Amino acid sequence: MNRIYSLRYSAVARGFIAVSEFARKCVHKSVRRLCFPVLLLIPVLFSAGSLAGTVNNELGYQLFRDFAENKGMFRPGATNIAIYNKQGEFVGTLDKAAMPDFSAVDSEIGVATLINPQYIASVKHNGGYTNVSFGDGENRYNIVDRNNAPSLDFHAPRLDKLVTEVAPTAVTAQGAVAGAYLDKERYPVFYRLGSGTQYIKDSNGQLTQMGGAYSWLTGGTVGSLSSYQNGEMISTSSGLVFDYKLNGAMPIYGEAGDSGSPLFAFDTVQNKWVLVGVLTAGNGAGGRGNNWAVIPLDFIGQKFNEDNDAPVTFRTSEGGALEWSFNSSTGAGALTQGTTTYAMHGQQGNDLNAGKNLIFQGQNGQINLKDSVSQGAGSLTFRDNYTVTTSNGSTWTGAGIVVDNGVSVNWQVNGVKGDNLHKIGEGTLTVQGTGINEGGLKVGDGKVVLNQQADNKGQVQAFSSVNIASGRPTVVLTDERQVNPDTVSWGYRGGTLDVNGNSLTFHQLKAADYGAVLANNVDKRATITLDYALRADKVALNGWSESGKGTAGNLYKYNNPYTNTTDYFILKQSTYGYFPTDQSSNATWEFVGHSQGDAQKLVADRFNTAGYLFHGQLKGNLNVDNRLPEGVTGALVMDGAADISGTFTQENGRLTLQGHPVIHAYNTQSVADKLAASGDHSVLTQPTSFSQEDWENRSFTFDRLSLKNTDFGLGRNATLNTTIQADNSSVTLGDSRVFIDKNDGQGTAFTLEEGTSVATKDADKSVFNGTVNLDNQSVLNINDIFNGGIQANNSTVNISSDSAVLGNSTLTSTALNLNKGANALASQSFVSDGPVNISDAALSLNSRPDEVSHTLLPVYDYAGSWNLKGDDARLNVGPYSMLSGNINVQDKGTVTLGGEGELSPDLTLQNQMLYSLFNGYRNIWSGSLNAPDATVSMTDTQWSMNGNSTAGNMKLNRTIVGFNGGTSPFTTLTTDNLDAVQSAFVMRTDLNKADKLVINKSATGHDNSIWVNFLKKPSNKDTLDIPLVSAPEATADNLFRASTRVVGFSDVTPILSVRKEDGKKEWVLDGYQVARNDGQGKAAATFMHISYNNFITEVNNLNKRMGDLRDINGEAGTWVRLLNGSGSADGGFTDHYTLLQMGADRKHELGSMDLFTGVMATYTDTDASADLYSGKTKSWGGGFYASGLFRSGAYFDVIAKYIHNENKYDLNFAGAGKQNFRSHSLYAGAEVGYRYHLTDTTFVEPQAELVWGRLQGQTFNWNDSGMDVSMRRNSVNPLVGRTGVVSGKTFSGKDWSLTARAGLHYEFDLTDSADVHLKDAAGEHQINGRKDSRMLYGVGLNARFGDNTRLGLEVERSAFGKYNTDDAINANIRYSF
């Protein structure tokens, strides 16, 4: 089929020319003598890739294999590919252009290249090949016309169908121009590939044959090419395979069998790769150079045009459709519209090439098939919108349909069984035939909408099968009946199946590669149900066939005449002979007994155990359900991708999401062994393997991943973004168990194999982002990168990852185990009622120990216990953490609390409140410590030690240790070595015993304090002798000193002495000094007066209705009043309040007086704070009032109301903490006044008011560091008076009036406020109540609009009081009717 020519150097051509090997004197000796290296004068500096033929033995052979097949690192678009030899030495970089896409080259033997959707380019002396395949080889296109060039070794065969799997390559724009391909500015690099006889050449020129022609593809780089024969031919010294400067980083020489293989060049003018020529000749095995025939542009254009009939134009003016008639006997047909007829040519007998291409133009065209048309290799191209229909059930077959970009074609014609409709072009084809279409569809570009209509029997089938390939097309389903989902396949590079809101069930997903996309791109949620599990009763029974061919794994039934039994066999390979007659197994057959049911179950179990694989992608608005029968253990493996807004549900079995191993070209084991014997171990024997390091990353995003009774694994190179809901399931994030497809890259069939592969680089590790919810004895294993929260109940969490970051997490009846080498950070709150076990691992809470952050937030962490095991165990508690739980360290582990960092400047209100609990420290820990051999460090920490504690080495820096009782009255802290700086130890005593600090070996540091809390009040006569601290005798006396501490409302200072005894030094409590702390008392008194301040706020808004009520004509009215204000008092007290009042009243005319009676409701929201407390009061209330206005100008106003208060305050004095309480109050007030009119528009109004109230008493009890503390305020009945004068002026219009006024009042208490009683272990003292008074002044406006609407606005302040209103704005509206 393919013969090689020898090359001879031609001075005229300035290069090599082809001479038949049968020509005279063309022998290897003469060729070698004549082939002077003229082309070596051409400097070649470029980077390229390799292909078939002869290559040198310095480079790994796998490079040339991967290059030819666009695999490994030579995937299309790859840039800056570095090439190294077998010794690891740098050879060069392919950096002049991105790696080209070789998919247009015949994928089996590489002797032809697609240059048009229906035409290939090769050499005419290749007369034996009759078909080609593209991509993964799951397709075959037959040659119908060879189109041989008359005077050039070139042909452009026509194919029987439009190719859908790949796009044609671009061809050179210059064509046969002498010297064109020496222009290294325009053509800096040349690549080739082919399947010629495979040789390896050593530096001595010795050839080793690795394989015969057409066995496999190899490829690489060649140098710039000189021209001869008027530019029709080009040549170069490609045989100089060790000359990297001349021939690039991967030199390759074409051998016998490479004829017709392509030569590509990167054209910098067009900025793309182009096909320059096809290889025609070389000068023998391991020769010096090759020749190529340049693509003859005029010739191929002529051949393309010869296969076209005249364009068909639809004209609306002609009226009616284009009527298409066809005579299948003659292969002639016509399209007629009115008086215009267009001839067409279709298939003649078996001659497909007789069919010509038709091009349709004219807007909104219509075609009516009157006869079934067999167009052979002819295609239809639509330049404008068309509708193609038939009224008699006619069909159409041909090469396929091309729909141009922006064009829509409505196709209402069915196909023929056994034939596929090929569709390409960027436009849209809508298939809208009727009934059952027995033909298939292969789509390679644009959009196809399946909208087949039901026939009179209700039957619908748009196509018998659908194949989506090339990565360019989209197929859209209008409903779920259009196609059987199991007949959909995604071929080479795939495309999109848009289910368009329709739910489908797939029993098989046939996806060749990552390009396969199953999507739903509409708002209506669709559910994809997977039902691929094989049931025993569905296992097919096969019988023996004379073809001797079958599928390995299939079940066969044999009625054995020799034993009179029915025997069942499983086929082991693809070919077979006779069944064994003695119920035995052999190399071909596996005997599986006499029971059909058992045999079918065995086959089904094996199939289900083997698992299922989907290489493709899930996208859009989808739910995916995969519910397997109980007992199925096989895995559903996804190494493609997912980005769906719905839920992926897996029930039973296994689910594995993983990255994808990079596919490589491969050879047989014998070839690999032969190369290995020569020192080249690069060659692979399968497309993927578990040992390879190069994997492709994959991403999976679900709204939710629901797992029940499932073994789920997230493998290497995979990222998962979701919320996992696991029920009785195992979840492994960072699963070393992965799968490979031993058929990867070779079509839709797959062969799964399970193994292990552990990512060593961070970039290859799995990543999880989201939340994991565990329930019902689920297990979570975190082995790789983890970012998310955990909510677990009755489950187990294991962490082995060194890159785990936990968000908000709550574990109930769930243990957390950190295994050896793990390093986890709980960056947000962590709460667990179970143990946290840290075994030679590190757990950091809030922040890592080496992290200096300026955006730290308060974090709460609680566990039943924190257990460290192993010398390398670490517990690091970052700054601004609240830790709770006992810490137990078995070995020489390390516990660190506190570190660097600053609070975020923009804390949320919640975090501000949380931070207030720190009491000025960075960290808070409540728990006991059991770490006799460990090292414990604390910085800026408040430790509430609630049980006896031990530490091997303890370092304290600005830390306070509070001894709390726990289960025993007093506790002891024991450490071998203590280094304490600026720290304090708060101990308790009952005047008999006390808490104690014991230091066994050494004690160092400075500026440390001892504080003592008294659990009962000692008398001044008590003489104490209680040891508090025991340390080695060499310890400095001033290591500890007595310090005054505020406890309750008192300053308590212990009296200490230092004594030596039995080789130890002790700090002994001899007595105490107690004094009242005025600051704490004042803070308490200020807080207890909040109710009075709230009372004054309400008083100032009791009687403000007079301006609303005067001169009202209506009989009733409703009103709303809004007050916003703030006040202040001693002790840094401020409050901000908003008061809302609503009411309704009725007017009664009583002689000379108008009486208004009404009811009201009120709500007040108050925020109050002082130096040592802050909080909020919310008040609700209601009441009634009566207002009387005399025509003389006199008035009165009386009111009574009830207020309920809800109070929530944080108190930072005397250890009071949070206090939530309720209170109640009553108000009764009366106001009188008289309005004197100075003129018709001005007035003065003296006023007097008296308000009585009832404020409920309040008592608070708590414990501060073991001391009982209380504060109490008695109930009180305040009586407040107010006198003052208001003056104003009224401005009037036709339907409006406006009154401006100003007022000055004096407000004063007639009774004292309530006394406050404070009590602690030092005793009880009373802060007496007091009177207060203030001046109030303000201005306001009252406006009337018509007879019904009144608006008011008033601004008011006060001065000279202990509590003052800083500002108050009062707005009201009234409507009368």
Curated annotation (Swiss-Prot):
Signal sequence region: 1-52
GO biological process, one term: proteolysis
Keyword Cytoplasm: no
PTM note: The C-terminus is blocked. Cleaved to release the mature protein from the outer membrane.
Top-rank taxon, per record: Bacteria
Influence of temperature on activity: Optimum temperature is 26 degrees Celsius for hemagglutination activity.
GO MF entries: serine-type endopeptidase activity
Protein name: Temperature-sensitive hemagglutinin tsh autotransporter
